[in-house]
Protein backbone atom coordinates (compact mmCIF):
# COMPACT_ATOMS: atom_id res chain seq x y z
CA UNK A 1 0.00 0.00 0.00
CA UNK A 2 1.38 3.39 -1.02
CA UNK A 3 -0.15 6.54 0.45
CA UNK A 4 1.20 9.91 -0.65
CA UNK A 5 0.04 13.40 0.27
CA UNK A 6 1.31 16.38 -1.68
CA UNK A 7 2.40 19.54 0.08
CA UNK A 8 1.32 23.02 -0.95
CA UNK A 9 4.29 25.34 -0.58
CA UNK A 10 2.89 28.39 -2.35
CA UNK A 11 -0.51 29.96 -2.69
CA UNK A 12 -0.78 30.02 -6.45
CA UNK A 13 -2.24 28.22 -9.40
CA UNK A 14 -0.50 25.39 -11.22
CA UNK A 15 2.54 26.61 -13.22
CA UNK A 16 0.89 25.66 -16.52
CA UNK A 17 -2.41 27.34 -15.65
CA UNK A 18 -3.08 30.19 -18.09
CA UNK A 19 -5.10 32.18 -15.57
CA UNK A 20 -2.44 33.44 -13.17
CA UNK A 21 -2.42 37.14 -12.33
CA UNK A 22 -5.08 39.70 -13.15
CA UNK A 23 -7.60 39.51 -15.94
CA UNK A 24 -6.64 41.23 -19.19
CA UNK A 25 -10.06 42.72 -19.86
CA UNK A 26 -9.22 44.41 -23.21
CA UNK A 27 -8.05 41.04 -24.58
CA UNK A 28 -11.07 39.25 -23.12
CA UNK A 29 -13.48 41.80 -24.61
CA UNK A 30 -11.79 41.39 -27.98
CA UNK A 31 -12.47 37.65 -27.75
CA UNK A 32 -16.04 38.08 -26.51
CA UNK A 33 -17.79 41.42 -27.02
CA UNK A 34 -20.62 40.30 -24.70
CA UNK A 35 -18.32 40.96 -21.75
CA UNK A 36 -17.86 44.68 -22.47
CA UNK A 37 -21.10 46.01 -20.89
CA UNK A 38 -20.23 44.29 -17.61
CA UNK A 39 -16.71 45.71 -17.22
CA UNK A 40 -16.41 48.67 -14.88
CA UNK A 41 -13.66 50.56 -13.10
CA UNK A 42 -13.61 49.97 -9.36
CA UNK A 43 -12.56 52.34 -6.59
CA UNK A 44 -8.92 51.36 -7.05
CA UNK A 45 -8.93 52.33 -10.71
CA UNK A 46 -8.84 48.72 -11.89
CA UNK A 47 -11.13 47.11 -14.42
CA UNK A 48 -13.42 44.47 -12.95
CA UNK A 49 -16.93 43.07 -13.10
CA UNK A 50 -19.67 42.74 -10.52
CA UNK A 51 -19.16 39.15 -9.38
CA UNK A 52 -22.58 39.15 -7.72
CA UNK A 53 -24.21 39.47 -11.16
CA UNK A 54 -24.67 35.97 -12.68
CA UNK A 55 -24.86 37.41 -16.21
CA UNK A 56 -21.54 39.20 -15.74
CA UNK A 57 -19.94 36.03 -14.42
CA UNK A 58 -21.26 34.01 -17.37
CA UNK A 59 -19.95 36.61 -19.82
CA UNK A 60 -16.53 36.42 -18.16
CA UNK A 61 -16.51 32.63 -18.51
CA UNK A 62 -17.46 32.89 -22.18
CA UNK A 63 -14.62 35.34 -22.75
CA UNK A 64 -12.07 33.17 -20.92
CA UNK A 65 -13.03 30.09 -22.93
CA UNK A 66 -12.96 32.01 -26.21
CA UNK A 67 -9.66 33.78 -25.52
CA UNK A 68 -7.61 31.00 -23.93
CA UNK A 69 -9.12 27.83 -25.42
CA UNK A 70 -10.48 28.92 -28.82
CA UNK A 71 -14.02 27.93 -27.82
CA UNK A 72 -16.16 30.78 -29.19
CA UNK A 73 -19.50 29.11 -28.49
CA UNK A 74 -20.34 28.40 -24.85
CA UNK A 75 -23.54 28.84 -22.92
CA UNK A 76 -25.48 27.28 -20.04
CA UNK A 77 -29.21 27.22 -19.32
CA UNK A 78 -30.51 29.56 -16.66
CA UNK A 79 -30.08 28.13 -13.17
CA UNK A 80 -27.19 25.80 -14.01
CA UNK A 81 -23.76 25.88 -12.39
CA UNK A 82 -21.35 28.50 -13.75
CA UNK A 83 -17.94 27.22 -12.64
CA UNK A 84 -14.70 29.18 -12.07
CA UNK A 85 -12.55 28.44 -15.11
CA UNK A 86 -9.12 28.94 -13.43
CA UNK A 87 -9.84 26.46 -10.65
CA UNK A 88 -11.21 23.91 -13.10
CA UNK A 89 -8.02 24.25 -15.16
CA UNK A 90 -5.92 23.49 -12.07
CA UNK A 91 -7.59 20.10 -11.63
CA UNK A 92 -6.84 19.24 -15.27
CA UNK A 93 -3.18 20.26 -15.04
CA UNK A 94 -2.67 18.27 -11.85
CA UNK A 95 -4.24 15.22 -13.47
CA UNK A 96 -1.71 15.65 -16.30
CA UNK A 97 1.08 15.48 -13.73
CA UNK A 98 -0.54 12.39 -12.21
CA UNK A 99 -0.63 10.64 -15.59
CA UNK A 100 3.05 11.42 -16.06
CA UNK A 101 3.83 9.25 -13.02
CA UNK A 102 2.77 6.14 -14.92
CA UNK A 103 4.20 7.38 -18.24
CA UNK A 104 7.92 7.52 -17.46
CA UNK A 105 7.67 11.11 -16.24
CA UNK A 106 6.19 12.49 -19.47
CA UNK A 107 2.70 13.99 -19.68
CA UNK A 108 0.75 11.91 -22.21
CA UNK A 109 -1.08 13.92 -24.85
CA UNK A 110 -3.31 13.19 -27.80
CA UNK A 111 -6.66 11.59 -28.48
CA UNK A 112 -5.55 8.15 -27.29
CA UNK A 113 -5.56 9.49 -23.72
CA UNK A 114 -9.13 9.17 -22.49
CA UNK A 115 -10.80 10.73 -19.47
CA UNK A 116 -14.23 10.34 -17.89
CA UNK A 117 -15.80 13.40 -16.28
CA UNK A 118 -18.43 12.15 -13.82
CA UNK A 119 -21.08 14.86 -13.58
CA UNK A 120 -20.02 16.87 -16.61
CA UNK A 121 -22.85 19.36 -16.11
CA UNK A 122 -24.26 21.63 -18.76
CA UNK A 123 -21.02 23.64 -18.83
CA UNK A 124 -18.69 20.86 -20.12
CA UNK A 125 -15.72 22.81 -18.75
CA UNK A 126 -13.40 19.95 -17.74
CA UNK A 127 -13.56 18.23 -21.16
CA UNK A 128 -13.08 21.59 -22.89
CA UNK A 129 -9.91 22.41 -20.97
CA UNK A 130 -8.48 18.89 -21.11
CA UNK A 131 -9.18 18.61 -24.83
CA UNK A 132 -7.70 21.99 -25.71
CA UNK A 133 -4.66 21.81 -23.41
CA UNK A 134 -3.64 18.19 -23.95
CA UNK A 135 -5.83 16.97 -26.86
CA UNK A 136 -7.30 14.28 -24.60
CA UNK A 137 -10.52 12.50 -25.53
CA UNK A 138 -13.38 12.70 -23.03
CA UNK A 139 -16.61 11.07 -22.04
CA UNK A 140 -18.80 13.29 -19.90
CA UNK A 141 -21.57 11.64 -17.89
CA UNK A 142 -24.54 13.13 -16.04
CA UNK A 143 -27.90 12.07 -14.63
CA UNK A 144 -29.57 15.25 -15.91
CA UNK A 145 -30.79 15.05 -19.54
CA UNK A 146 -30.69 18.84 -19.98
CA UNK A 147 -27.03 18.91 -18.90
CA UNK A 148 -26.15 16.19 -21.42
CA UNK A 149 -28.06 18.01 -24.16
CA UNK A 150 -26.25 21.31 -23.53
CA UNK A 151 -22.79 19.80 -23.01
CA UNK A 152 -23.17 17.82 -26.24
CA UNK A 153 -24.26 20.96 -28.07
CA UNK A 154 -21.14 22.79 -26.87
CA UNK A 155 -18.86 19.90 -27.84
CA UNK A 156 -20.42 19.55 -31.29
CA UNK A 157 -20.58 23.24 -32.18
CA UNK A 158 -16.98 24.29 -31.56
CA UNK A 159 -14.69 23.15 -34.39
CA UNK A 160 -11.66 23.24 -32.07
CA UNK A 161 -13.12 20.51 -29.83
CA UNK A 162 -12.44 16.94 -30.94
CA UNK A 163 -13.32 13.66 -29.27
CA UNK A 164 -15.81 14.74 -26.58
CA UNK A 165 -18.83 12.49 -26.07
CA UNK A 166 -21.57 13.01 -23.48
CA UNK A 167 -23.56 10.09 -22.07
CA UNK A 168 -26.68 10.09 -19.91
CA UNK A 169 -26.49 8.04 -16.72
CA UNK A 170 -29.97 6.52 -16.54
CA UNK A 171 -29.56 4.97 -13.08
CA UNK A 172 -28.85 7.50 -10.33
CA UNK A 173 -27.43 4.75 -8.11
CA UNK A 174 -24.63 4.01 -10.58
CA UNK A 175 -21.54 6.10 -11.18
CA UNK A 176 -19.51 4.05 -13.66
CA UNK A 177 -21.86 1.20 -14.61
CA UNK A 178 -23.92 2.07 -17.66
CA UNK A 179 -21.32 4.64 -18.74
CA UNK A 180 -18.07 2.67 -19.10
CA UNK A 181 -18.57 0.15 -21.90
CA UNK A 182 -17.29 -3.44 -21.50
CA UNK A 183 -14.30 -2.99 -23.82
CA UNK A 184 -13.50 0.62 -22.89
CA UNK A 185 -10.36 1.80 -21.06
CA UNK A 186 -9.95 5.18 -19.38
CA UNK A 187 -6.66 6.71 -18.33
CA UNK A 188 -8.46 8.64 -15.61
CA UNK A 189 -11.80 9.61 -14.17
CA UNK A 190 -12.53 12.94 -12.52
CA UNK A 191 -15.41 14.32 -10.51
CA UNK A 192 -16.59 17.40 -8.66
CA UNK A 193 -19.08 15.64 -6.35
CA UNK A 194 -22.27 17.16 -4.96
CA UNK A 195 -21.36 18.97 -1.76
CA UNK A 196 -24.61 19.21 0.18
CA UNK A 197 -26.88 16.55 1.67
CA UNK A 198 -30.20 18.29 0.98
CA UNK A 199 -31.80 21.11 -1.00
CA UNK A 200 -32.20 23.18 2.18
CA UNK A 201 -28.51 22.80 2.96
CA UNK A 202 -27.60 23.82 -0.59
CA UNK A 203 -29.82 26.92 -0.37
CA UNK A 204 -28.23 27.93 2.92
CA UNK A 205 -24.80 27.51 1.35
CA UNK A 206 -25.73 29.81 -1.52
CA UNK A 207 -26.97 32.44 0.93
CA UNK A 208 -23.67 32.27 2.82
CA UNK A 209 -21.78 32.82 -0.43
CA UNK A 210 -23.86 35.90 -1.18
CA UNK A 211 -23.12 37.30 2.28
CA UNK A 212 -19.41 36.60 1.85
CA UNK A 213 -19.51 38.33 -1.50
CA UNK A 214 -21.15 41.41 -0.02
CA UNK A 215 -18.52 41.51 2.73
CA UNK A 216 -15.77 41.43 0.09
CA UNK A 217 -17.37 44.01 -2.19
CA UNK A 218 -14.87 46.70 -1.23
CA UNK A 219 -11.96 44.60 -2.44
CA UNK A 220 -10.42 45.00 -5.89
CA UNK A 221 -12.09 41.89 -7.27
CA UNK A 222 -10.25 41.82 -10.60
CA UNK A 223 -7.82 38.94 -10.02
CA UNK A 224 -8.58 35.25 -9.80
CA UNK A 225 -7.28 35.03 -6.24
CA UNK A 226 -9.66 37.75 -5.08
CA UNK A 227 -12.48 36.15 -7.00
CA UNK A 228 -11.89 32.83 -5.25
CA UNK A 229 -11.92 34.51 -1.84
CA UNK A 230 -15.32 35.96 -2.67
CA UNK A 231 -16.55 32.52 -3.81
CA UNK A 232 -18.45 34.28 -6.55
CA UNK A 233 -18.65 31.89 -9.46
CA UNK A 234 -20.80 29.05 -8.12
CA UNK A 235 -24.07 30.75 -8.99
CA UNK A 236 -27.03 28.53 -9.68
CA UNK A 237 -26.82 24.81 -9.87
CA UNK A 238 -29.35 22.04 -10.32
CA UNK A 239 -30.03 19.32 -7.75
CA UNK A 240 -27.49 16.89 -9.24
CA UNK A 241 -24.82 19.59 -9.26
CA UNK A 242 -25.27 20.74 -5.66
CA UNK A 243 -26.64 17.98 -3.45
CA UNK A 244 -27.34 14.28 -3.09
CA UNK A 245 -28.60 12.09 -0.27
CA UNK A 246 -25.81 11.77 2.28
CA UNK A 247 -23.84 14.65 0.78
CA UNK A 248 -20.26 14.55 -0.43
CA UNK A 249 -19.11 11.73 1.87
CA UNK A 250 -21.84 9.31 0.80
CA UNK A 251 -21.14 10.06 -2.86
CA UNK A 252 -17.37 9.54 -2.73
CA UNK A 253 -17.70 6.35 -0.66
CA UNK A 254 -20.12 5.00 -3.26
CA UNK A 255 -17.63 5.96 -5.97
CA UNK A 256 -14.86 4.09 -4.16
CA UNK A 257 -17.00 0.97 -3.77
CA UNK A 258 -18.13 1.01 -7.39
CA UNK A 259 -14.63 1.66 -8.72
CA UNK A 260 -13.60 -1.88 -7.83
CA UNK A 261 -15.75 -3.34 -10.60
CA UNK A 262 -13.81 -1.25 -13.13
CA UNK A 263 -10.33 -1.71 -11.65
CA UNK A 264 -9.00 -3.15 -14.92
CA UNK A 265 -10.63 -0.49 -17.10
CA UNK A 266 -9.41 2.67 -15.37
CA UNK A 267 -5.82 3.58 -14.59
CA UNK A 268 -6.51 6.43 -12.14
CA UNK A 269 -9.77 7.21 -10.37
CA UNK A 270 -9.91 10.75 -8.95
CA UNK A 271 -12.39 12.97 -7.16
CA UNK A 272 -12.34 16.43 -5.67
CA UNK A 273 -13.08 16.56 -1.93
CA UNK A 274 -14.33 19.82 -0.44
CA UNK A 275 -14.49 18.74 3.20
CA UNK A 276 -11.01 17.93 4.47
CA UNK A 277 -12.35 15.52 7.09
CA UNK A 278 -13.78 13.34 4.32
CA UNK A 279 -10.31 12.50 2.99
CA UNK A 280 -9.54 10.10 5.85
CA UNK A 281 -12.92 8.39 5.43
CA UNK A 282 -12.26 7.83 1.73
CA UNK A 283 -8.80 6.41 2.51
CA UNK A 284 -10.33 3.92 4.96
CA UNK A 285 -12.83 2.74 2.37
CA UNK A 286 -10.22 2.42 -0.38
CA UNK A 287 -7.87 0.45 1.85
CA UNK A 288 -10.75 -1.84 2.87
CA UNK A 289 -11.52 -2.75 -0.76
CA UNK A 290 -7.88 -3.41 -1.63
CA UNK A 291 -6.69 -0.35 -3.51
CA UNK A 292 -2.93 -0.52 -4.11
CA UNK A 293 -2.02 3.15 -4.33
CA UNK A 294 -3.71 6.30 -3.00
CA UNK A 295 -2.51 9.86 -3.50
CA UNK A 296 -3.87 13.18 -2.23
CA UNK A 297 -3.02 16.21 -4.34
CA UNK A 298 -3.60 19.64 -2.85
CA UNK A 299 -4.15 22.76 -4.93
CA UNK A 300 -3.96 26.38 -3.83
CA UNK A 301 -5.66 29.44 -5.25
CA UNK A 302 -5.07 32.51 -3.12
CA UNK A 303 -6.27 31.72 0.40
CA UNK A 304 -8.34 28.75 -0.78
CA UNK A 305 -6.96 25.23 -0.52
CA UNK A 306 -8.65 22.47 -2.49
CA UNK A 307 -7.69 18.86 -3.03
CA UNK A 308 -8.42 15.72 -4.95
CA UNK A 309 -7.77 12.10 -4.08
CA UNK A 310 -6.48 9.70 -6.74
CA UNK A 311 -6.30 5.93 -6.52
CA UNK A 312 -5.28 3.05 -8.72
CA UNK A 313 -5.59 -0.72 -8.46
CA UNK A 314 -2.31 -1.13 -10.31
CA UNK A 315 0.53 -2.54 -8.26
CA UNK A 316 4.11 -1.24 -8.28
CA UNK A 317 3.25 2.38 -9.11
CA UNK A 318 6.35 4.41 -8.28
CA UNK A 319 5.18 7.69 -6.74
Swiss-Prot record:
Location(s), subcellular: Cytoplasm
Enzyme class, UniProt record, top EC level: transferase
Coiled coil segments of this chain: none
Keywords: Cytoplasm, Methyltransferase, rRNA processing, S-adenosyl-L-methionine, Transferase
Catalysed transformations (reactions): adenosine(1618) in 23S rRNA + S-adenosyl-L-methionine = N(6)-methyladenosine(1618) in 23S rRNA + S-adenosyl-L-homocysteine + H(+)
InterPro entries: METTL16/RlmF, rRNA_lsu_MeTfrase_F, SAM-dependent_MTases_sf
GO biological process, one term: rRNA base methylation
E.C. designation(s): 2.1.1.181
GO CC terms: cytoplasm
SUPFAM superfamilies in the record: S-adenosyl-L-methionine-dependent methyltransferases (SSF53335)
GO MF annotations in UniProt: 23S rRNA (adenine(1618)-N(6))-methyltransferase activity
Function per UniProt: Specifically methylates the adenine in position 1618 of 23S rRNA.
UniProt family annotation: Belongs to the methyltransferase superfamily. METTL16/RlmF family.
PANTHER family xrefs: RNA N6-ADENOSINE-METHYLTRANSFERASE METTL16, SAM-DEPENDENT METHYLTRANSFERASE
Name the record gives this protein: Ribosomal RNA large subunit methyltransferase F
Organism: Aliivibrio fischeri (strain MJ11)
